[in-house]
């Protein structure tokens, strides 16, 4: 598994000041994707336990509200085990900080029954669709994408949108 970059202080991908990791590899190839350099599964840098340690360390400051996971596609079958490992470790160390994740997969069709969902607080799901692009939307690029409260969705066994 590989990653493209880590942003130490990110204010555009989730609420508050966050640490963001952009995983490498995506098979969706959305038209006009903002992050095409993350498509190649062989690009970027190796994702190791040391990288997880670095992310955990970067999140230690009180002003960091959580971790954001983007891509590429962190939930792709080639990446999901590493994503799960990162999420588990993050929540062990920071149970009161949030994990936000972006995926082209639909939560109710692919992720609802995956173990990684137990650790994610907010998920933006759905592929970016150029024809539905709306720059006024918060945390997403196109109107088909949903901002989901994952824990409430799991509890209710149906998609519950995140309202803030």
Where are these regions (language model features)?
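Conserved, mostly hydrophobic/aromatic
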Residues: 21, 30, 123
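A generic structural signal for alpha->beta connector loops
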Residues: 96, 119-120, 144
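N-terminal [4Fe-4S]-dependent radical SAM core
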Residues: 1-22, 27, 35-41, 160, ...
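Conserved C-terminal portion of the radical SAM core fold
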Residues: 60-69, 93-94, 98, 124-130, ...
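Conserved Radical SAM active-site core
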Residues: 1-3, 17, 35-101, 107-113
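Structural recognition of alpha->loop->beta junctions
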Residues: 53-56, 60, 112-132
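P-loop/Walker A phosphate-binding loop and immediately adjacent motor/lid segment at beta-alpha junctions
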Residues: 78-83, 88-91, 133-164
């Amino acid at each position: 598994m590989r990653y493209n970059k880590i942003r130490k202080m990110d204010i555009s991908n989730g609420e508050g000041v966050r640490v963001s990791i952009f995983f490498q590899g995506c098979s969706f190839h959305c038209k006009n994707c903002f992050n095409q350099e993350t498509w190649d599964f062989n690009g970027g840098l190796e994702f190791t336990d040391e990288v997880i340690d670095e992310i955990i360390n970067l999140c230690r400051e009180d002003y960091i509200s959580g971790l954001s996971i983007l891509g590429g596609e962190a939930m792709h079958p080639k990446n999901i085990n590493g994503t799960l490992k990162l999420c588990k470790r993050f929540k062990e160390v920071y149970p009161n900080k949030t994990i936000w994740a972006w995926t082209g997969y639909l939560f109710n069709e692919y992720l609802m029954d995956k173990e990684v969902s137990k650790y994610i607080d907010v998920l933006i799901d759905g592929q970016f669709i150029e024809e539905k692009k709306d720059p006024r939307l918060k945390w997403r690029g196109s109107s088909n994408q949903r901002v989901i409260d994952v824990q409430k969705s799991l509890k209710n066994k149906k998609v519950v949108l995140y309202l803030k």
